[in-house]
Amino acid sequence: MFVSALPECFPIQYLYDYVKSKDKTERVYAQLSNSMKGDVRILKKFLQHIEVYGAEIAKEGFSGYVTEALIFYFGSFEKTIKKISELKKGQVIGKSTKKFDSFVVIIDPIDNNRNLGTAISIENLGKFVLASRAFLRNPSKNFFKKPISKRIMKNTDKIIVV
């Protein structure tokens, strides 16, 4: 009896898609100036502070790639915050001939038929808009501090301050 030791095989299309998607971040990041790369890091800290950074399904937040795309389109942290503070429902960031039905449309800089904004919840988008407006009214280093964990805040009745 002959037993094949070959692993499960997939059409080459999947490999191509994997390489293509992995390469997107590198291609966008390579187009950013050093100043813009610094602004990507600043934007990520800002989003972490308001607890909307993260691409996990449960988080429904802004991925690292989305932050890179926003800086790519707007050019700097300051311009991104200004544009986000003025954001309207259904507004399109980037250029695409395809129509999308979501609260915010952020066109993938590499694939203009892909909306990066579909995974972002309306609540997280709203937090970003409101935090951007607050930052513009009163810029502060406090917008970049690590957030206090909800787990810690939930147990504040058990904390003793000396």
Question: Each predicted region: which residue ranges?
Answer:
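Short helix/loop capping segments that flank catalytic or ligand/cofactor-binding pockets
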Residues: 9-12, 80-82
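Conserved catalytic core of two-metal-ion nucleotidyltransferases
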Residues: 1-9
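E2/UBC-UEV (E2-variant) core
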Residues: 16-32
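Surface-exposed beta-strand edges and their flanking turn/coil or helix-capping segments
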Residues: 11-16, 121
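Conserved nucleotidyltransferase catalytic core and NTase-mimicking acidic/glycine-rich helix/loop elements
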Residues: 35-162
